[in-house]
Amino acid sequence: MFSHLRNRLSVNRPQALSSQIRAASTMKEAIVSRGPRVHIIDSPIPKAGPGQVVVKIEYAGSNPKDWKRPEYWGSKATMNQGDDHSGTVYEVGEGVSDFKIGDRVAAMHEGKQPGGSYAEYGVSWAYTTIHLPEQTTFQEGAAIPFAAFTAACALYAKLDLPYPRHPVSDDQKIPLVIWGASSAVGSYAVQLAKKSNIHPLICIAGRAQEHVERMIDGSKGDIVIDYRKGHEAVAQKIKANLSGQKLEYAFDAVSEMGSYQTICDVLDQEIGKITLIIPAQSYSDIPKTIKKSVTTVASVHEDLKEFARGFSTYFGRGLQDGWLKAHPQEVVPGDWRG
C-alpha cells in the first residue's frame, strides 16, 4: 500500500467479505502504525452523523501523509490513515440533501477522525463528497478528492487567484509557477489554473514531463521545465518565460530539496506570493517581503466548508463535462495488506 509510486497515486480495493460479517454490523479496517505497519482489525460499521455520508468503499487512495504521520508522530497517529475513497452511498446523515443511498461518489474523509478510508465503509462530510458520473470509474474517483481539494485551496484560498467562474480575460497574462506539476496535487492545480485561464503556466517537473505536456497549452506560453537541470538553469528558464513580466504567484507542491528557494529567487520581491505544502517547516529563509503561506487541506474542515462544497460540485461537473481528468493511478494488489 505504501510503496513509493512516482507521479502516480496508489489505490487499493477492499475485498468483499461474507454476508455474515455485514449482518453483524462489523467491517474490516486497516490500522497504520510506524514502520509502516498495517494491522487489520474488526470494527463497527460507522454511522452517519448530521451532515455526513457513509460510503461502501470500492477503492481507497493512498497519499504520502498516510505513512508519514505515524512515522513522525508514533502512537499518536496510529489509526486508519486513509482519507481518499470511492464507492456507493450507504447512509446519509441528518441535513444531507445532495446525496442519496446508491449514489456513485468519491469522497475525502476528515483526517485524524474515525471512519477513515482503509476500511469497507468510510465517513465523509457532504461538503467533501463528489458525485461521480458513469464515465468515471471508482478507481479514478479514489485518486481525486484529497489532491484536488488541496490544489483548489492553494490556488484560490491562499494565492487568491481568479476562480474558474470568473476566468482571466484572454488579453491578460498572469504567470504562475507550479513546482511539482506532475504530482497529483500539481496536476490538479494545472487543470484548475487552465479553467481560470491563467497563463503562462510555468510547470516544474522531472521524469513525468510528458504527462504535464499533455495538460498545458503551449500556444498561451505554458512550458515545462526539468528541475533536474539545477537551480540556476531552472531560474533562468523561468525568467526567460516571463518575457520581462513580474512573477507574482507560485505554488510549490514539493516544498523541499531547494524548490522554494529557487522560486523565491525569481518571485517579485515586493508583490510575490508563494504557497507551500509542508506545514512542519518554518521557511524562515524566504525573504520577509514575499508573502508566504502553507496550504493544508484540513482548512476545508475549518473556515472553508462552503468553499469545499462549491468545489465538490464543480469537480463533479468537471468529470461530467470531461475537462477534469483523474491523476494516473496504480492499483496495489492485496487490498489493505498491499
From Swiss-Prot:
Substrate binds at A147, A148, F149, T150, A151, A152, C153. InterPro entries: ADH-like_N (IPR013154), GroES-like_sf (IPR011032), NAD(P)-bd_dom_sf (IPR036291), PKS_ER (IPR020843), Trans-enoyl_RdTase-like (IPR047122). Keywords: NADP, Nucleotide-binding, Oxidoreductase. Induction: Expression is induced in presence of sodium nitrate, and repressed by glutamine. The keyword Nucleotide-binding applies. GO terms for molecular function: nucleotide binding; oxidoreductase activity, acting on NAD(P)H. NADP(+) binds at residues 65-68, 182-185, 205-208, 227, 277-278. It comes from the Eukaryota. Its EC number is 1.-.-.-. It holds the Pfam family ADH_N. Disruption phenotype: Leads to an enriched product formation. Belongs to the zinc-containing alcohol dehydrogenase family. Trans-enoyl reductase; part of the gene cluster that mediates the biosynthesis of fusarubins, highly pigmented naphthoquinones responsible for the coloration of the fruiting bodies. The non-reducing polyketide synthase FSR1 is responsible for the condensation of seven acetyl-CoA units to yield a haptaketide. After rings A and B are formed by aldol-type cyclization, the PKS-derived product is released as 6-O-demethylfusarubinaldehyde. This is Trans-enoyl reductase fsr4. The gene is fsr4.
